[in-house]
Amino acid sequence: MTKPISLSNRALYARLLSYVRPYWKAVFLAVIGMVGTAATEPVFPAIMKYLLDNGFQAKDARMVWLIPMGIVTLFLVRSVIVYCTGYLMTWISSRLVTDLRRTMFAKLLALPTHHYDEHSAGQMISRLVYDVSNVTDAATSALITLVRESLTAIALIGYLLYLDWKLTLITLAIGPVIAFTVKSFSKRMRAASQKSLQAMRFISHTIEETISAQQVVKIFGGQERQQKQFFEATEQFRRAQMREAIPASAMTPITHIAASVAVAIIAFLALSQSTGQAGASAGSFISFITAMLMLISPVKQLATVNPTIQRGLAASESIFELLDAAQEDDRGKRQLLRSKGEICFDNVSLRYLGAERFALNDISFRITAGQTVALVGASGGGKSTISALIPRFYPVTSGRVLVDGIDINDITLASLRQNIALVSQNVILFNDTVGANIAYGSLQTCSRDDVIRAARAANAWDFIEQLPNGLDTPIGENGAKLSGGQRQRLAIARALLKDAPILILDEATSALDTESERQVQAALAVLMKNRTTLVIAHRLSTIEHADCILVLDQGRIVETGTHAELLRAGSYYANLSRLQG
């Protein structure tokens, strides 16, 4: 498995903010707005100072109107700036979420097959949904708080220094206390946040697994087991959140206590007139206290934003782990335009990542253009593994796989796979229409007539015509509205439409009734003519006419020959034939 990346908080946050860089103009405008908001903060205590020192004694009638109007104007301007800043940051946040999810999804499509073997669908879904939300909070919401409250604090501290720099420096002694508190709690919150993310991935995995296996759950009475697993997952998440809440909740009261001590010191020194200007007049004193109390809010916000940042950093580690994962090796430079269909396995061995034994051992065989070769043997013998090596779903451990005499590692993945059609016993359909499932991916440019011809050849047109909207009928999640045989025939129609020179059939007719199988076999016989076909078969009756049959056992080829030759040999294949009657 891919190990989590290890970066310092600063490097991790810098990388996270790099995704905000394309929107620097909007960020710049938002920062200007925050500067404007911060600049208005000291104005109110300054007005209070003037009001207390001069307002009640002043005889100027204009001040009776100017001061109230100034207060209203101040908060009106501030409100407009806050609105514009909030809207801009929300826009940036939505763009960041979209960009991150698109980048991650594109990465998912480029990951090698073994990555999907090691990570559940629920875990990957959680990364795209939950982790991205946490990262966005850290990169936008937390950024707003950091910039806005820092600027506000700077503006208020500047005003306090203007009123009485000595008293201000004394009260700023609480700064190291708050900084120490934040630093000491950050590591604990980061660890707790990582536990929360892991627990959320387990929740997503449990939900995804239960939904996809709902029929098995019902028929085998697994509701209690799945519910227990889900309860355990949610309990893990709750406990992780509570561990995160301990330091997060403690930071605010500690900040308040430190601030209250500072205010108490100010009050004592001002009232005792042991310092200068702040205690010189009632206006100065009230203005100083007001500014000091206003300073508590940004300080508190700066302290409480840390949990959001730590959650975002923990989530960004998970996201960057995915983004930094190795993609499929596609260093091949040669384009395979239209393959002849010649396939050669040259002393191929394969051991899956983390496996102790080899799945394939020294496999060698050659398929000439247009030949039909069948792979038979017990489950786990290596049949599906061989078929997975041709489109390079897995890299070989040793040896070579060649197509038209070219090592497939030297061929671009796209052009190699363009020459291969696959029909698996595990039919995959998409939540779309019948026609879109047949003309899927690169086939979507095919004409409607071509789609109909493929459906007819796969013995699927009769049932398609009976559907409410024919080819335009939605089929539900993975073809849930169709029968097993209908789903299988759509997959065959998709392969027929692709018209690739290399065809891989993994028990492609297993879900068909006798009559449908007869018709599909006839259609496949036409399709297989002058095409190289690799058939993985469990029922030997389906491969009697294969040009060559390879019998596999525990990752090795133990017999080779035609159906008749292998029966006459009276060995492994003949025993399989007798067992199937």
From Swiss-Prot:
E.C. number(s) listed in UniProt: 7.5.2.6
Pfam families for the chain: ABC_membrane (PF00664), ABC_tran (PF00005)
InterPro entries, A to Z: AAA+_ATPase, ABC1_TM_dom, ABC1_TM_sf, ABC_transporter-like_ATP-bd, ABC_transporter-like_CS, ABC_transpr_lipidA, P-loop_NTPase, Type_1_exporter
Catalytic activity line of the entry: ATP + H2O + lipid A-core oligosaccharideSide 1 = ADP + phosphate + lipid A-core oligosaccharideSide 2
Entry-linked PROSITE patterns: ABC_TM1F, ABC_TRANSPORTER_1, ABC_TRANSPORTER_2, MSBA
Top-level taxon in the UniProt lineage: Bacteria
Domain ABC transporter, first and last residues per copy: 343-579
Record field: transmembrane: 27-47, 63-83, 154-174, 251-271, 279-299
Enzyme class at the top of the EC tree: translocase
Statement: the UniProt record of this protein carries the keyword Nucleus: no
One GO term describing the cellular component: plasma membrane
Keyword ATP-binding: yes
Record's protein name: ATP-dependent lipid A-core flippase
Native source organism of the sequence: Albidiferax ferrireducens (strain ATCC BAA-621 / DSM 15236 / T118)
Gene designation per UniProt: msbA
